[in-house]
């Protein structure tokens, strides 16, 4: 069981709602994934009619909505978007995203920290998307964020955990949930993140753009479960180039 702020989650797989070919495919994929939390770009919601064909399928599944501030370039932009999201969707949960660079969509650490501090004070449950920077993640924890969401690789790149060494440090130091976000392009990437001790992963592109998004959702569901089980079982730390026989015959042969 994973607890974030005031909610418990059985599933450690969180899903993004973008890039699906239709609302129907999205809904079926979400159901197949077993996920209980879905991110939603505020720019895709009609604020005058928030119960449109994007929001309704998610609400019908009883999932936790996590609106994000994708498109915000400054802390001020993100704070404004967050207030709109709370008003339109009736949730204080927020994925904080600030990325001024349109090419790589890398998060701005300074603006993210600034916005997080303000939004926490305003009563938001803030989950910031951030670089895999252990110092920044600790600062975000200190200002009261409910979790941190460091990237594995640039958004939508499907490159896997390019930041694995820094993710390990973040996980080791954190006293709050660590959700690996961005760059997870295959179920094996999700397994790796969970094996190293991440509390959850967020996946969008790898599922939504798969040939069969519903089947891929199921595969990611299973991958996250297996990765977490491996972590809890305790992975062997005896990684070495030198061989080590599992059943050495030395003493047996010497006794003959």
Swiss-Prot record:
It is found in: Cytoplasm. Pathway: Cofactor biosynthesis; thiamine diphosphate biosynthesis. It is an enzyme of class 2 (transferase). GO terms for cellular component: cytoplasm. GO terms for molecular function: thiazole synthase activity. Catalyzes the rearrangement of 1-deoxy-D-xylulose 5-phosphate (DXP) to produce the thiazole phosphate moiety of thiamine. Sulfur is provided by the thiocarboxylate moiety of the carrier protein ThiS. In vitro, sulfur can be provided by H(2)S. This is Thiazole synthase. It comes from Idiomarina loihiensis (strain ATCC BAA-735 / DSM 15497 / L2-TR).
């Amino acid at each position: 069981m994973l607890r974030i702020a005031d909610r418990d989650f059985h599933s450690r797989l969180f899903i993004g709602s973008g890039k699906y070919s239709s609302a129907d495919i999205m809904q079926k994929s979400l159901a197949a994934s077993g996920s209980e939390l879905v991110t939603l770009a505020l720019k895709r919601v009609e604020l005058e009619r928030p119960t449109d064909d994007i929001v309704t399928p998610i609400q019908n599944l009883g999932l936790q909505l996590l609106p994000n501030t994708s498109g915000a370039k400054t802390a001020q932009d993100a704070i404004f978007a967050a207030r709109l999201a709370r008003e339109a969707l009736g949730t204080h949960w927020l994925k904080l995203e600030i990325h001024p660079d349109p090419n790589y969509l890398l998060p701005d650490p300074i603006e993210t920290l600034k916005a997080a501090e303000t939004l926490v004070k305003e009563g938001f449950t803030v989950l910031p998307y951030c670089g895999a920077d252990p110092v920044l993640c600790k600062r975000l924890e200190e200002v009261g964020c409910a979790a941190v969401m460091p990237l594995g690789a640039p958004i939508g790149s499907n490159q896997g955990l390019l930041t694995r060494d820094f993710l390990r440090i973040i996980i080791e130091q954190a006293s709050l949930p660590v959700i690996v976000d961005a760059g997870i392009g295959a179920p094996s990437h999700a397994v790796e993140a969970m094996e190293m001790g991440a509390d959850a992963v967020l996946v969008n592109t790898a599922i939504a753009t798969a040939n069969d998004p519903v089947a891929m959702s199921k595969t990611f569901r299973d991958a996250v479960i297996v990765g977490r089980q491996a972590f809890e079982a305790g992975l062997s730390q005896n990684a070495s180039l030198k061989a080590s026989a599992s059943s050495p015959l030395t003493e047996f042969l010497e006794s003959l």
